[in-house]
Every structure is written in C-alpha cells, then in structure tokens.
C-alpha cells in the first residue's frame, strides 16, 4: 500500500502535466494559422504551421497525412474563397447590376404628350412646356396678344371706363386702389392693373394662338412635323440598346483582363510556395 501511493501520485501528476500541455497547444492554435492534430491512442500532439519546418513523431506523421487528404477532399467553404474567384464573383455581380439598371431605364421613360393638346396639367405648366418646345412661335404670339390686351385696357381707361370699383370688388388692397385714384398717370396704372388681373385669359389666348400658328406652319411646310410616338420611342430604345451593348463589351473586356491578372498572381504564388 505504501508503494502504490507514490505510484498513483506520479501518474496523476503526469496526467495533469499532459493535459496542461494540450490546453496550451489548443490555445496557441486559435491565434496562429496551422493544423493541429491529437493522436487518440497516445497523448501525442503534432502541430504543423504553414510554410515552417517542424519535427513530428513517426506515429503522428501517418495521422497528419490522413488528415490532409481529408481536408483536400472537402469542398472549400464560402468564407475561404481564393482571391481570384472572389474578385470574379464581385465583378460579375457589378456587371449584372449595371445591365439590370440600364435595361430598366428605357421602360421607365413615359410618353410625353404635346403640351398644346395636354389638358391634364395646369395652365401655367402648359405655358411653360409650350415655351420650351415651341418658343420660337410662342414668343411672337405672346408679344402680339399682350400688346393687344394692354392697348385695349388703356383705351378703355382713357374713354372714362371706371375700373376702380371692379378692382375693389376683386379684393385688391386699399393702398393699391388709392394709388390708382390719386396718381397723375392713373390711366396707365389702371391699364397695367387690369393687364395683370387678366393673366389667365392672356395665357389661354396665347396658347390658342400658338397652336393655330403651329398647325398653319406645319401645313405649309415651314415647320417639321414631329414623328409618331411609337416610332420615336422605338428609335430611342434602339439607341439605348446600342449604348448598353457597348458598355457591356467594355465591362467584359475589363473583367477578362482582371481575371487574367488574378490568375497570373495566383499561379505565381503557387510556384513560390
């Protein structure tokens, strides 16, 4: 009994020492890149860091070879992709996203009706769009009609037509009405006030005169008629398709160049290893 007590104590000390060594090796493996293997039959540990010389036990070498074969047979994980394949995936996603956005842009373009015929928008918006599209026709028509309007109001004020009660009825401020009453140039100011009040009517007359003038000029060949909406949209679609195809070819060329560069880098790294 006295001989067995020290033997058991020595065995326990040996086991605790081996367990501590195993724990240290596992903790070290967490912070370094390498392959850590434990032989189950005996407490033999083989640690093989990447690209470093190591001393292995004969029984652990066989276990290490088997483990390497198993790791080579396993498919690579998603998070551990090689650099070339990772860049290829990113470039392909960029090409697909750019093509999808460019294909969506022509379909999003809506048909824009003629502002002279579109009555769904307000009068001011119609006047503004007509000015952008038919400015060369609208400006002379607007100047002529505005002169006629102002001349009519001025002639009425000279002939003694009292417009001040009408202005008071419309709700103009008293300061403006007093200026029109007491000013020496009351006729001109009265005509101008009536001219500004009649702005909606003036815009309507201008748009009507512009549409009539445009039709007259087109019928006599002085102004080119716009193409039908379908043909216009088809032409724009063909132009956008050509631009998209050119951009796709450029992106494909860039992608192939980058893939070749990455392949060369990967092959060079493999040769060095």
UniProtKB/Swiss-Prot annotation:
Q: Provide the Gene Ontology terms for cellular component.
A: cytoplasm; membrane; mitochondrion
Coiled-coil stretches are 233-272
Q: Where is this region: Disordered?
A: 95-116, 247-273
Q: How does it sit in the membrane?
A: Single-pass membrane protein
The UniProt record lists the keyword Cell wall biogenesis/degradation? no
Q: Which Gene3D superfamilies match?
A: 6.10.140.1430
Q: Which terms are listed as keywords in the entry?
A: Coiled coil, Cytoplasm, Membrane, Mitochondrion, Transmembrane, Transmembrane helix
Give its localization. Membrane; Mitochondrion; Cytoplasm
Q: Which family does it belong to?
A: Belongs to the FAM210 family.
Protein name as annotated: Protein FAM210A
* Species for this entry: Rattus norvegicus (Rat)
């Amino acid at each position: 009994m006295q001989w067995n007590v020290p033997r058991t104590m020595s065995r326990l000390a040996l086991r605790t020492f081996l367990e501590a060594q195993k724990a240290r090796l596992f903790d070290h493996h967490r912070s370094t890149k390498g392959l850590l293997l434990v032989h189950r039959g005996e407490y033999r540990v083989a640690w093989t860091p990447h690209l470093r010389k190591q001393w292995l036990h004969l029984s652990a070498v066989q276990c290490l070879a088997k483990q390497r074969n198993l790791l080579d047979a396993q498919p690579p994980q998603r998070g551990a992709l090689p650099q070339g394949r990772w860049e290829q995936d990113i470039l392909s996603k960029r090409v697909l996203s750019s093509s999808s956005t460019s294909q969506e842009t022509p379909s999003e373009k809506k048909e824009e009706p003629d502002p002279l015929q579109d009555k769904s928008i307000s009068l001011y918006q119609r006047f503004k769009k007509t000015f952008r599209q038919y400015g060369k026709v609208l400006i002379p028509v607007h100047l002529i009609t505005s002169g006629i309007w102002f001349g009519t109001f001025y002639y009425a004020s000279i002939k003694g037509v009292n417009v001040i009660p009408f202005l008071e009825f419309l709700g103009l401020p008293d300061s403006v009405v007093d200026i029109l009453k007491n000013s020496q140039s009351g006729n001109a100011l009265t005509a101008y006030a009536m001219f500004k009040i009649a702005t909606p009517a003036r815009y309507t007359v201008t748009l009507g005169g512009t549409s009539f003038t445009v039709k007259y000029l087109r019928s006599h060949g002085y102004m080119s008629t716009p193409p039908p909406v379908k043909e216009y949209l088809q032409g724009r679609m063909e132009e956008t398709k050509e631009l998209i195809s050119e951009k796709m070819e450029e992106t494909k060329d860039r992608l192939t160049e980058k893939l070749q560069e990455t392949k060369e880098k990967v092959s060079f790294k493999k040769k060095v290893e």
